[in-house]
Amino acid sequence: QLAAVKQHGYEIKFIKNPSEAIQLAAVKRNGTSIKFIKNPSEAIQLVAVKQDGYAIQYIKNPSEAMQLAAVKQDGYAIRVISNPSEEIKLVAVKQIKSMR
């Protein structure tokens, strides 16, 4: 199971009750694979958004810190954040500008 999710993060959707280690391997490979994890820990959530900012859309009520990590990874992730603070907006714009 671990080898499968290390190769393809989405393989986690076929695993019942994956361990924390398997969850971690999945989101390290593909952050958006978090959508297949029921009640992921905050640590798993953070790894997911650091791997792919768009993973934030699969996190219920993300904290300001989680939102910040998402837009630092990909400024365009702001598109999927509900009511971002001014700080989050500013960091997102700076990140997008730095990509040009």
Outline where the language-model segments fall.
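Alpha-helical scaffold segments
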Residues: 1-100
